Amino acid sequence: MPETASTANVLPKSDPDAIKTEQDALEGYENGGDALQGTMDGHVETNGDAPATENHHEPNHIHDDERPAKRRRTRDSTPPQNTPKKMKPVSPPWKKISADGPTSYTENGRRKSGRINTLLPEPSPLSKSRTSKRSTGANSNTKTEIHLTNGNSRKMPNGSHKASPATKAPSKQAPASTPKSASKKPTETRTSSRSTRRRSPTPPPPPKNSTRSRRSARFSDAVIKDEAVQDSRTATSNSTNRSPRIKLRVGRSGHIPLVHPGQVRKRPKIGTSFEDFWTRAGDIPVEEGGLQASEDGPQYTDELAERDARVILRVEKEVEDGGMLSQGRCSIFLPEPAEEPPRQWARQDHMVKAMTNFRKLMLAEQQRHRIAAKKVAEACRDEWLRRQPKSEEEIEAEQRAVWISRYRIVAKTLFGTWENVRTEVNRRRLAEWEQEEQRRVKAALNEAVNLSEQKLQARQAGLDSEQLSEEDGFDDLSDDMSMADDDELGLASGEDEDDEDGDADSDIMSSDEEEGDEEDQKDIGDENLTQEQLRAKYAHIPELEKPSTETPVTEPTPKDTDAVDTAQATATENAETSDESVDMDDDMGSTDMDSDEEDEEEESEEESDEDAGGLLGLLFGKSELKKMNSEAVAETPADSKEDSEMPDVEAVSDGEGAEENEMSLIQMPDPEPHESGALEKSTKEAVEEKEQIPAAMQDVAAGQDGLSNTDNNVQEPASQDNDVAMTGNDPEEPSALTFEKPHSPATEPATNPPSRVHSTSPPATSETKPSELDTASTEEMAVDKHDTSRSPSPQPSNHKIEVPFLLRGTLREYQRDGLDWLAGLYANSTNGILADEMGLGKTIQTIALLAHLACTHEVWGPHLVIVPTSVMLNWEMEFKKWCPGFKILAYYGSQEERKRKRQGWNNDDIWNVCITSYQLVLQDQQVFKRRRWHYMILDEAHNIKNFKSQRWQTLLGFNTQARLLLTGTPLQNNLTELWSLLFFLMPAENGVGGFADLQEFHDWFAKPESQILESGREQMDDEARAIISKLHKVLRPYLLRRLKADVEKQMPAKYEHVEFCRLSKRQRELYDGFLSRTDTKETLNSGNYLSIINCLMQLRKVCNHPDLFVDRPIMTSFRMQKSVVSDFEVTEQRVQRLLHDPSPMKDVSLGFLNLMPTQCESLSTTQAERISQLSSHRKLMELREAQKIRAQSAHANLDPSTVASNIGYLESGARWGRYEELQHCVYLNALRRQKKPIYGKNLIELLTIGTDKRPYKPRPKIPRQVLAWFEEESTLVQSMIPTVNQRADSFKTIIEKFSCVTPAVVTRDMEQFVLGRKGIEAFSDEDLKLSAPVRWAPFLPKEAPPDPWHEGRMRLSIQFPDKRLLQYDCGKLQILDKLLRKLQAGGHRALIFTQMTKVLDILEQFLNIHGHKYLRLDGATKVEQRQILTDRFNNDPRILCFILSTRSGGLGINLTGADTVIFYDQDWNPAMDKQCQDRCHRIGQTRDVHIYRLVSEHTIEANILRKASQKQMLDDVVIQEGEFTTDYFNKLSVRDVLSEKLDSKSEGLDAADAALDRVLGGPDTNNDQRRVGRALEQAEDREDVAAARVAEKEIQADDADFTEKPSNNASGTSTARQGTPAGKSVLDGGLDDIDAPHVEEVLEYNAWGDKMHTIDDYMLGIMAEQLKDTKLELPKDKKKGKKKGKDTRKR
């Protein structure tokens, strides 16, 4: 029978720690097997070294009481050297970081760490030690064998086996047995069939020296012990010659996991019954099923209770008198010692202090003497050493020290010099980079301008976007994107026209698609040809035929296709070479007078290319083109091609601009094919009519500004010199445009010679400011044009787009133009912005566009219209009014309502247009994204001005075919918002195409934007103005902006007034007090954006009304429960009793004895006689006599010894007492009945005159005497002596005004001490009389009891703020009161806008106080109620005011019933205020509109107004002056169009004219004063120039807030920024070469004849060469550094 394994049977006494090592290894294997593997790799194999051996002949070489050596050898044999090093496997992620096994142990009462102490003590016997057969006789000296878990082993040199590193697969785990069997019998080791195969032992590696690290030596002892354990376990198996292969399997865990509840051993029962359980469970822990809890502590036994009782009794005994804890003996009862007052200083104290101070002075003097003596000694020593003769070594050391110090100084200086050189080189590199970046930005901007101009000209010529392919300058677009756009348009067209198989448009489209592949192959073939080959190929272009008007539109023939291809190829060449017929702004061309010969050759090639075609080739024949070009070349030199807008742009060749500076502006999808036929037809008709006009008529027509064609509006004005001839079409419109005829011959003569300046701007009004780049050359023309601004609109010409038959109503002329423009956008597959001013009918034009799509293109939808919540119903009503044929879905309501409306969402027949709000789009964005929309229209598109907002990002991802933005304010704050709108229209698809990048866009226009915001529009230099002009050209294809003053000449005028309001006294105190607070100053200086905004909002609240900042409190008095005087009540009563209590036996009451006759005058004689008659004197006398008899008969003798005598004596005393009472009553009754008056009350009242009540006769009680009483009453006497109620009424106003100071404290019991008891009774009686209810009848109004003191009493007890203080506390309300009274007297009605909702509440109180009728609209107003309120206000003239919120109530509401707009406060965004004022100044308004702005002077509101003016100025320059109108090019002649291409010096200006223009200014009126100022700067002193600049800035800063439009004449002295180009400032020394003083330069040459340079040049060259390939550190953007946590990614 095998014995159970134990520590005694397995290990010898000499190895007690081996069990611990084995246990750690087993636990490591349970945790994943990596610990054991790590042990075998790290300890047995020693990190790849030869296997370690053991020597059992020396079993006691390790001692437990000695510390092992650091480099101790644990094996007899030397491990081999050439064994490859094996890497330790990486720990798996599921393995715990904690150490396997205990990390500390306790030895002899001391805790030791197991990591640094390698010898562990002998652990306790293993409770779960595994048993093995043949475990006896383990103490053997035979060779051992180490068995691994995988069964693979090999013999060591001494007979042991080592695991093969090649086999690492773990064996399968043996099936687990039940817990019962596991506990009863030992576990037997099982081996698999795979492990029973014989394997030849691996030959041992060659011997090698050990190369292991010190780290493995720490675990050598554990390895030896592990080997000893294995040796003892396999001793019996090694008795034979051949040791069998035995595989030991170790379980993953010490216990079998439980997989079923039945495997859990049930806890044995404690006791047979509950009583038995209660008896036993007290000592058993809760964990084992008992009742003993560990936190309860030991059981409270009788002994413990007895001990505690003895302690308590002892304490009680000691507390008694005489005990240890008594009050007399215990120290705790002693009073705390009182602090003694400090002792007063005496003479002794002053003496001690003086002595201490003197001691300190003596010690300090002694220290100074010692230091001085030491210094003298050292000086003497140094002097003695100096006088001694020096040896050579000392001299050498001194010289060495001197040279070392000099070397350090030189090295430091040289190092600083090289650092300065490095800084200078980096500065130059940075400057070069900035110049290169500017060139790149300008080249990209020029490319964008060229693309926009090409698109405009292509649209104007009627070719739409067919002429603009990838070769027309859009090199930045990839071929894949173009093909994808073609496919997308083809699919869309196919979907729209599935049911129209016989339609001509669909036929054209299909034919276009079929020939697309052939055209692509042809284009690919043309790409490989040179210019000469292309000229030869397309030399003979057939002329366009003259089709008749009855000819139907047919499919394009291959001949037409070749013509189109030819035009495309020619347009490509012209675009690349900056042809004058295509480019209106050639910034990419040569700008230097010193152009190379290559530029001249390119220009000659361009002239020859013009013969081939271009955009003019589609309108004219080859002969006409050659004639026109020859005339232009004859008049214009070839070398005069300069850029007149950007003189500082360096020359960049077209090839470089195309390759290096590519810029992706917008993606140009192909147009719909069915439009091409109509456009070609219109083009042919235009050419036909043009050819029929005689040449003489053409010359005359060329000079007229108002002449235009009917169909395609092709203008051909020519100058009198016939130097230029080309078409002047409007690239703005794809359809026919409106022309304005001259109103008078004096204004626009028929033979007006062309000038070099731009055309005149629209009429200058309060809304439109003339652009400084496009103003007239003479002031007379501008005046005449301004005088005709109120004239009726001209008669419209024939429009290309007919009014859809679905539209109900008549469109105005400008609305027809807008419809043409929108239809042209759709035809070109271009998205746009309709930015007409508020009130011009953007809604109607949008509805007309959708109706046009349904009628012409048969596209009924689905369309998505996203509008603000306030105008949803307005849009629905407009659709039903103007286009009832559309099915409208108003998508709003609760979640259930919206879900019900989405039923049949994907069915196109249920509805055509979906109208919803921005909020609902964000809430249900997943539903909207799944639907494919044809047209997405955004009303009030400035809601998506922030590209970082969720609204912008959500709407950007919608699946739409076309997009249209409606906004009255395309530019509100900055150009970033404008970029957000443009990129939303033209997003990039898969990172390709789309509008320009935000950073690129900012680089283009950062300079003019900063100049406008900082210095105003008048301070812009020429470069900034040129950039603004190019911005206009970039925006013109996508933006249509008309003003009311431009399109509607009968619009009423609009006047703006700024009312400055003084702060009230309370406002000024709150305003100054808030600013003077310390925390406010710290917040404003901290730079925290949110905190600063919060402070500014508080200041704005004070300016609007002080109640928004601090409410006026309700003042009440503090009520005391008990007054101070009441504490002396008892004392007062006692004193009064002692001093005033009379003695009844000393004083005689004369009134009681009837000795005062006048005391009874209050009784009448009748009453006195009746009292005498009712006297009961006789009855009282009888009772007295009867009581006397009873008293005398009572027992009178007293015998104290008997009870009867005592009782009888007491009864006798009581009887005599009653007798005395009856006798006293008889006495009193006799005196009282004898009281009689001398005259009596009735006689006194009869004889009393009553002078105090004489003026008022009492009202007679007889009715017939009442009339006589009224007649005898005197009103004069009544007015002279008023009653109490009349007096109270007269003082009521004074009491209400001046009874405003409540007492600080009031009490309840003060009246009785002040008035006394009688006074309180008198007032109480009077109060009861006053509070008596007044009789009233049902038909009479109720009357309050007449209480004359009620008003004063209430006002002195509680103080409510006077409602009139609401107005007097605020300066704005005072001005508003006067303004409303003035408006009401004049019959005007007003809209009052404010930004804050709480201000609306105050305005309501204000209007209620004054009794004005008003309506209110804010964000809380429901959508259904907004239209009702709007209609009510417009139809009810009795309503004076309509108060609205700027943010909620000002959008999309038509309030033409009012003619006055009052802005109570300024919005941060001036565009919001402009939208609000346009709600009444719009089409339909018949009266002039006055706008009043209430601004608190000397406050933050003045600064807000100034900032708003700056933002409005930026909008005027970027948007208003751009003239984004349909008739923009109608006012331009050919000369104006090509003025940017002409060189000023090519017009015959010589050097004298240039010098004269330099001093007095040239023909350009915008720059004359700037040039004069520059010339004056050169003549004046530097100090005078600097002072003039400062003064001019101050003047312009003051004028910027009051002037509406810029003045043509600038100040006398101009600034360098204004007139001097970069690098030409006088203060910077940048003079011209002519004006600079001539200094003769002396050149030096070296021996080789080369020019000698300075050392600085050499150092700069060396450093530049070294830093040539290093990274240049660019300056950090300060704005980005402040964006903490914000998104700064590029979009």
UniProtKB/Swiss-Prot annotation:
Compositionally biased spans, kind Basic residues: 1677-1691
GO cellular component terms, semicolon-separated: Swr1 complex
Domain of life: Eukaryota
Compositional bias (Polar residues): 126-155, 706-722, 749-778, 1605-1618
Residue ranges annotated for the Helicase C-terminal domain, each copy included: 1375-1525
Function recorded in the entry: Catalytic component of the SWR1 complex which mediates the ATP-dependent exchange of histone H2A for the H2A variant HZT1 leading to transcriptional regulation of selected genes by chromatin remodeling.
Protein name stated in the entry: Helicase SWR1
Lineage: Eukaryota, Fungi, Dikarya, Ascomycota, Pezizomycotina
Gene: SWR1
